[in-house]
Amino acid sequence: MTDAIFRGMTRAELDRQYDQRTLVPRMALLFDDWRRRSDIFASRRGLPHRISYGRHQLQGFDLFEVPNPQGLHIHYHGGAWKALESHHAWWVAEPWLNAGHCFASIDFRLVPTVPLAEQVGDARLALAKAQELMASSMSLTVSGHSSGAHLAAMAVLAPEEGQLPPDCDHLILASGIYDLEPVRLSGRNDYLRLDHHDAVALSPKARLEGTL
């Protein structure tokens, strides 16, 4: 397809923009390194506690604790919404634990096993469950990487209907996707299966702009 479909870009150009392998062709080696770094970290620090927030095995998170914590840091892993798991991000915990914060690495059901809307729902449920473990004096920091940054933003900015936004002190989003409309028009939609309404409803950008 050679016609421009989004801000002057063709489908092929969008596909290149949303395929990390165009810049990092050996992605599998990077993922393996994350697991290796996580295993090395856990061998020194000890394994985390597994906390469930739902019935599915992926509706849970890995919690690293510290004595007398100052805060809780919650992290959502990347993986294009369809891959990886909480274990890949254990190594991210080290500086937070050293600073006196507990660290929760979140799992969630993956696309296309569930639609993206349900994955976002998992992200919200996990955040709510993790907050139940906090003392009122603890600070809350939330982060996410890549597609996990999208989930982190949605969990913080767009709670379930009737719920108040979490009292989040800091939101750290790395290389995230905040407007899903160009994603919908790219090859990613072969497994995301979003329509225009979905793309708007599940976009943090729309929440911030007040278009919902």
What is the role of each PLM region?
Residues 17-67:
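N-terminal cap/lid segment of alpha/beta-hydrolase-fold proteins
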Residues 170, 176-183, 196-212:
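The feature captures the conserved acid-bearing segment of alpha/beta-hydrolase catalytic domains
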Residues 125-188:
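Primarily recognizes the serine-hydrolase "nucleophile elbow" in alpha/beta-hydrolase
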Residues 51, 74, 104, 141, ...:
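Hydrophobic/aromatic beta-strand patches that form the interior of the parallel beta-sheet core
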Residues 80, 109, 177-178:
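Catalytic metal-binding/acid-base residues of hydrolase active sites
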Residues 84-93, 104-141:
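Catalytic nucleophile-loop/oxyanion-hole region of alpha/beta-hydrolase
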Residues 66-96:
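Short, surface-exposed "cap/lid" segments of acyl-processing enzymes
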